[in-house]
Amino acid sequence: MSRYRGPRFKKIRRLGTLPGLTSKRPRSGSDLKNPLRSVKRSQYRIRLEEKQKLRFHYGLTERQLLRYVHIAGKAKGSTGQVLLQLLEMRLDNILFRLGMASTIPGARQLVNHRHILVNGRIVDIPSYRCKPRDIITTKDKQRSKALIQNYIASSPHEELPNHLTIDSFQYKGLVNQIIDSKWIGLKINELLVVEY
């Protein structure tokens, strides 16, 4: 199954807020056209919606998500917590959380177009797994710096997670440690995803 490129507001209306998918918000009037019917939600639907929330927020394909669940199952600790840590330590997500991109798809594009350096080397793989003490910078080219500068200036200044630090003047981010579960950007029940 390929990456989702369709209408984003449809997914937001169905699944709730997904900050990584889009920075826009649907108008409140458009939500009232089709109010949620009081239909009993089955257990399967609840689990499926949690899995889809995770998939669309991080911009994963079905196969990528299954691979991450498999890796998390083999690791020590709670499978759900390890899964969320793996997803949060992806390069595209870290760029989004640092404020260098407005959405995770925007961060993917920055990485794919070779604007981002990790420890002084160009990385063009959005799923690159960042490690503690990784330094994330932009290329020295004026175009790369201008893109990041626009994103940083236009993004709302949210509280930065404690596992990341940013120097917005040098366009440099630092991964301090593995993310703690309370700083994860998406409110989700990870056990339902693993059970699915």
From Swiss-Prot:
Residues 89-150 form the S4 RNA-binding domain. Transmembrane segments: none annotated. The keyword Cell division does not apply. GO terms for molecular function: rRNA binding; structural constituent of ribosome. One of its GO terms (cellular component) is chloroplast. The keyword RNA-binding applies. Pfam families: Ribosomal_S4, S4. One of the primary rRNA binding proteins, it binds directly to 16S rRNA where it nucleates assembly of the body of the 30S subunit. With S5 and S12 plays an important role in translational accuracy. This is Small ribosomal subunit protein uS4c. It comes from Agave bracteosa (Squid agave). The gene is rps4.
